[in-house]
A protein has these predicted regions:
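Extracellular beta-rich repeat passengers
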Residues: 504-777
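Positively charged n-region of N-terminal signal peptides that target proteins for export
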Residues: 1-4
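Phosphate/dinucleotide-binding and metal-coordinating scaffold of catalytic cores
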Residues: 12, 16-517
């Protein structure tokens, strides 16, 4: 009590003094937006603008400081949630090119452990969670500003995440920045949060993001005093190992369910699967042969990959890379984050809280030299990771790092990569010593019945009053532990979101969502798609599709027999292939099944995904999906696309790099052609009778159009959200607006159009743009 009183007396004086001393450097709260007008270069360098400094001034400075004092003086060694209140703030970003942006947002303290906050001289330095309400920073609106010492070696965090992204994994953009938070100047780690922006930057569609639900994780340690004793001395690892046995998963973006019934179904399916995987994990790390701490034992990659060999190897490589950078902390069950990739049917890891220290010979966040379980493909994964590390272009990596605030000579970059390889070799040696021992064989995946039994037994000890929510088709039931005394549970949509995000508490009682049919065998069920190999690609198709795939003719004919039935082609190469989709005619006022998406998250009647393509020909008629044709994450060239009579959009291309010689689209109820998140060279387009836009270009796309003819559309060509259009020849007839450029989403700039020859006939408006955009002739 005396300690708290001294702090409050000191800070009453400090608050008054600080308000005087940093009054001259405070951000003018009346300013908003950026001082530079949009240029083509701004959109070209949208994700790579160098940041000189980030400044944050909280409103209600006195209340903010008092809250921080309460965090510091709180008797627990962990920060309680009620002290993580949000405060309005002004944010200023100073870029190297001289641009200055004034943003608005809300900030709160971030971090569970007390190492996230400390006194620094006469001020406080702490980790922050920031949500922007106005503007973005390099396309990011939700981010963390970490104290420089809480995520491992700061430069290693930046290096690790950048390499992971180049290897095709999900990792947050991480930047070393100079920062000022109120009166405190410091170097900090800027890191985007796991959110929609992270997914789309990494060429993934928005979908469920999940993590470990820690509601019970701190239950047994929350009252341990904040003293000078170590966590080991007070028994924290032992207590948290016990509480981790009742740790399931939760959604971090449960608001997805607001988008519709199918989005809700996808989200519930994801959490159901991951709960089964967590239950298996928690029943395995301490069993008849195992006696591991929770942070030393990994989730089973066979389950996370839903038993797909290639995905298991990919996940093994991720685990090995984390271990090779001494980032074992990221592999502990309580620190795992995942994206449910509904198209490829597996849980993709999202790098989080890794604490890397590449130069060390051994990690400080594990007690073991070999982590169980090993998959049967572990040797193959080690070999592939070695190859990928050897193929890193260290000069390019050095240049990339400079945009992320890390200035490092190439020789030092090489040393980092070589040390990762040395660490990997050490891991391989330890693995070879134990891989044929009984313990390694014991920890290979084996089916386990009644995986809830272990959970119920431990929950009875950790939180005996907790209530479990199980699902039976569309109904929810509220049950006591062991799923006893269940009764129908009527819940509002807002409370359902709290439940799925692990935050539903009613009358001081924790509610835990467990799901439906928690049986590990359900993870291997194939779903409603059939599959057929075509050359080195795979065609997936639903019951309502009749498929003719002729590899000799290099031709795929798809006849749709049921409205809304879909087909998608995944991975591999399509060279000189012709694809014909013949849909079932439907009435415009009847909504098809699985609209606008299906359980895979697909919007196209025909979708082409993760393909290398050359001289492809596509014809699609009478589609009855959100998109007639959807091309995702594909590279190469298309000779011709013809689309006729689409229920909604005609062509939708996302996350791709394509040259298309000819596009002809007739009669789309919504847009004729959409292009987003990619680079597109379009030679000739003929778009007729488009219900909304002829061509829509968005989300950081760079598009070159040689010739385009649009007849009958609300907007001829729309360019938005940090996209660039180089338009050579256009004839736009019978439109409300010929050309439009605008900003639609907060995380982007406006659109930029550079036109040479544009003919605009029978249109109300030739040009329409907002203050964020530019059109030049």
């Amino acid at each position: 009590m005396k300690k708290i009183l001294v702090f409050f007396i000191f800070f009453q004086f400090f608050i008054s003094l600080s308000q005087i001393l940093f009054a001259d450097i405070k951000i003018n709260s009346k300013l908003s937006g950026c001082i530079h007008k949009l240029t083509k270069k701004d959109n070209l360098n949208f994700y790579n603008s160098k940041i000189n400094k980030i400044e944050i001034d909280t409103h209600n400075y006195k209340d903010w400081t008092v809250n921080n004092i309460r965090i510091i003086t709180n008797n627990s060694r962990f920060t309680p949630n009620h002290l993580k209140k949000r405060f309005d703030a002004d944010i200023k970003v100073i870029y190297e090119d001289g641009n200055i942006c004034y943003l608005k947002g809300r900030v709160r303290h971030s971090g569970d452990a007390k190492d996230h906050i400390a006194l620094k001289g006469n001020s406080i330095i702490q980790s922050l969670d920031v949500t922007l309400s106005l503007g973005n920073i390099r396309g990011i609106t939700r981010f963390k500003l970490f104290k420089p010492d809480v995520r491992g070696v700061l430069e290693d965090v930046v290096i690790q995440n950048h390499i992971l992204r180049n290897f095709g994994y999900l990792a947050p953009r991480s930047i070393k920045v100079k920062a000022r938070v109120n009166e405190t100047q410091s170097i900090m780690l800027f890191q985007e949060k796991a959110a929609k922006e992270l997914l789309e930057f990494n060429s993934r569609r928005e979908g469920p993001i999940l993590e470990a639900d820690q509601k019970f994780f701190f239950e047994l340690v929350k009252n341990i005093p904040d003293n000078n004793l170590s966590n080991w001395s007070v028994g924290t690892p032992i207590l948290r190992t016990k509480s981790s046995k009742v740790m399931l998963s939760k959604l971090t973006n449960a608001n997805l369910i607001y988008k519709g019934d199918i989005h809700e179904k996808i989200s519930l399916d994801a959490i159901n699967k991951l709960n089964s995987i967590f239950l298996y994990w928690s029943s395995r790390f301490q069993d008849e042969k195992n006696n591991f701490y929770f942070f030393d034992y990994d989730l089973d990659n066979s389950l996370l990959a839903l038993f797909d060999k290639n995905k298991i190897i990919k996940l093994d490589i991720y685990n090995l890379f984390m271990q090779s950078t001494n980032s074992h902390h990221a592999l502990g069950g309580s620190n795992r984050k995942f994206y449910w990739n509904s198209i490829e049917n597996y849980f993709e890891p999202i790098a989080y809280d890794a604490n890397p220290d590449i130069s060390r010979n051994f990690s400080t966040t594990t007690t073991l030299k070999a982590r169980y379980p090993f998959s049967i493909f572990y040797d193959e994964a080690i070999k592939k990771l070695n190859e990928e590390l050897s193929n890193i272009n260290t000069r390019k990596l050095k240049n990339d790092l400079s945009f992320l605030g890390i200035i490092m000579p190439e020789e030092a970059v090489k040393e980092k990569i070589n040390k990762i390889k040395v660490n990997l070799d050490f891991i391989n040696q330890n693995y070879n010593k134990v891989k044929n021992q009984d313990l390694a064989l014991h920890n290979q995946y084996k089916y386990k019945e009644n995986i809830l039994e272990h959970f119920n037994k431990n929950l009875k000890e950790v939180d005996p009053k907790a209530l479990l929510i199980k699902r039976n088709n569309s109904d929810l039931f509220k049950c006591e532990i062991y799923l006893k005394n269940c009764e129908l549970f009527d819940i509002s949509e807002s409370d359902l979101i709290k439940l799925l995000e692990g935050e539903l508490v009613i009358k001081n009682t924790n509610y835990q969502y467990v799901g439906q049919n928690l049986d590990l065998n359900a993870l291997s069920q194939k779903g409603n798609y059939y599959s057929k190999k075509f050359l080195n690609s795979t065609i997936f198709y639903e019951k309502g599709i009749v498929l003719e795939a002729d590899q000799i003719k290099n031709e795929i004919i798809i006849n749709q027999k049921e409205v809304g039935a879909r087909v998608y082609i995944l991975n591999g190469n399509l060279i000189d292939t012709a694809i014909f989709f013949n849909g079932v005619e439907t009435f415009a006022n009847i909504e098809p099944q699985n609209y606008p998406i299906d359980i895979k998250g697909l919007t196209g009647c025909l979708s082409l995904i993760n393909l290398e393509i050359e001289n492809l020909k596509i014809s699609a008629t009478n589609s009855n999906c959100e998109d007639a044709v959807n091309v995702i994450n594909s590279r190469g060239s298309i000779k011709k696309i013809f689309i006729g009579n689409s229920y909604s959009d005609g062509l939708d291309v996302d996350f791709s790099d394509l040259k298309i010689d000819e596009i002809e689209i007739l009669n789309s109820v919504n847009d004729c052609a959409d292009f987003s998140y990619g680079n597109y060279k379009l030679m000739n387009l003929k778009l007729n009778n488009c219900g909304d836009k002829g061509a829509s270009l968005g989300e950081t796309s760079t598009v070159e159009i040689n010739n385009i003819n649009v007849n009958d559309a609300k907007i001829g060509i729309a360019t938005k959200d940090s996209s660039i259009l180089n338009l050579k020849n256009a004839i736009l007839i019978n439109t409300d607006t010929c050309l439009a450029a605008y900003k639609k989403k907060q995380e982007f700039n406006g659109g930029f159009i550079e036109g040479k020859k544009v003919v605009c006939k029978n249109s109300f408006t030739k040009i329409k743009k907002d203050i964020y955009s530019k059109i030049i002739f």
